[in-house]
Amino acid sequence: MGGLTASDVHPTLGVQLFSAGIAACLADVITFPLDTAKVRLQVQGECPTSSVIRYKGVLGTITAVVKTEGRMKLYSGLPAGLQRQISSASLRIGLYDTVQEFLTAGKETAPSLGSKILAGLTTGGVAVFIGQPTEVVKVRLQAQSHLHGIKPRYTGTYNAYRIIATTEGLTGLWKGTTPNLMRSVIINCTELVTYDLMKEAFVKNNILADDVPCHLVSALIAGFCATAMSSPVDVVKTRFINSPPGQYKSVPNCAMKVFTNEGPTAFFKGLVPSFLRLGSWNVIMFVCFEQLKRELSKSRQTMDCAT
């Protein structure tokens, strides 16, 4: 097709932030049941004496939740999840190119691997501090079960914000920031840098054009790498965030208890749904992100030319 291509039009910061937020929200809506299954598998084993149903695998978990708690339970915490994407994903993804440009300002060469990694670390860290309260609420709503007469801790998203702030203080909304920071910078670096490098390699070597198939394959590879790298930290983060006050003394204490009580394999609980979720999330998000950036930039340039 003729006309402008992605390389012809450089998206503005506003276009990148908006495109990242919308693409991340769309990906979250589609993959949220997989995320809920991942959370349920990760917190399973915290209370060995509990009579709550045991989950087995991704499909087994999803089936069990639907059968015992209803389909909508798979989307418990979705409003907080969307708030998280708008507040954090838009920043960690939308600011990535801008931070790279800042780090390489005045240099005629392309961004180095070091600058890509530093950009991923920076945007991932900023996003965590801003979006942590939404992560806490999302995880707790996903983890709570209504089985066997267990009274849920929270009745909804805003009820969860209020109760956590009231009973645990405002710091309760930032509980688990340390493991989430570790997880997010690992995922952000691995995800964005791998995607960037794979896309560049495919295009530079004329394997794939800078279009949907290239974005799809690059995103899938990035999702696999990010999942494998972040799984242990992700399990600790989920356990620590979901725990009531006093269950764990600290993040290292949480990690030690997981290791002592359940063994090293517990750090990879929910690995399959994590990959299914992050892999599919990456594909949807990156493909939509690239297309939105391209179309919005072309529309903006067309409007500028018309005026």
From Swiss-Prot:
Q: According to the UniProt record, what happens if one changes K269S? A: Severely reduced H(+) transmembrane transport activity
Described by its record, this protein's role is as follows: Mitochondrial protein responsible for thermogenic respiration, a specialized capacity of brown adipose tissue and beige fat that participates in non-shivering adaptive thermogenesis to temperature and diet variations and more generally to the regulation of energy balance. Functions as a long-chain fatty acid/LCFA and proton symporter, simultaneously transporting one LCFA and one proton through the inner mitochondrial membrane. However, LCFAs remaining associated with the transporter via their hydrophobic tails, it results in an apparent transport of protons activated by LCFAs.
Note the effect listed for R54S.
Does not affect H(+) transmembrane transport activity
Localization per Swiss-Prot or TrEMBL: Mitochondrion inner membrane
Give all Cysteine sulfenic acid (-SOH) modified positions: C254
Q: Which GO terms describe its biological process?
A: adaptive thermogenesis; brown fat cell differentiation; cellular response to cold; cellular response to dehydroepiandrosterone; cellular response to fatty acid; cellular response to hormone stimulus; cellular response to reactive oxygen species; diet induced thermogenesis
Keyword NADP listed? The answer is: no
Mutation: M229L; reported impact is: Risk factor for type II diabetes mellitus
- Listed Pfam families: Mito_carr (PF00153)
Q: Main location per UniProt?
A: mitochondrion
Hey, which stretches end up on the Mitochondrial intermembrane side?
Answer: 1-10, 97-116, 196-212, 290-307
Under catalytic activity, the entry for this protein gives: H(+)(in) = H(+)(out)
Describe the processing and modification events after translation.
May undergo sulfenylation upon cold exposure. May increase the sensitivity of UCP1 thermogenic function to the activation by noradrenaline probably through structural effects. May undergo ubiquitin-mediated proteasomal degradation.
Family named by the database record: Belongs to the mitochondrial carrier (TC 2.A.29) family.
Looking at the UniProt entry, the stretches that span the membrane are 11-32, 74-96, 117-133, 179-195, 213-232, 267-289
Q: SUPFAM superfamilies, from UniProt? A: Mitochondrial carrier
Against PROSITE patterns, the record matches this protein to:
SOLCAR (PS50920)
The record describes its quaternary structure and partners as: Most probably functions as a monomer. Binds one purine nucleotide per monomer. However, has also been suggested to function as a homodimer or a homotetramer. Tightly associates with cardiolipin in the mitochondrion inner membrane; may stabilize and regulate its activity.
UniProt lists the gene as UCP1
Which positions in this protein are listed as binding fatty acid 16:0? K56, K269
* Superkingdom as given in the UniProt entry: Eukaryota
Query: Is DNA damage given among the entry's keywords?
Result: no
Query: Where does this protein come from, organism-wise?
Result: Homo sapiens (Human)
What protein name applies here? Answer: Mitochondrial brown fat uncoupling protein 1
What UniProt keywords are attached to this protein's entry? Diabetes mellitus, Ion channel, Ion transport, Membrane, Mitochondrion, Mitochondrion inner membrane, Obesity, Oxidation, Repeat, Transmembrane, Transmembrane helix, Transport
> What ranges cover the Solcar repeats?
11-102, 111-201, 210-295
GO CC list? mitochondrial inner membrane; mitochondrion
Its tissue distribution reads:
Brown adipose tissue.
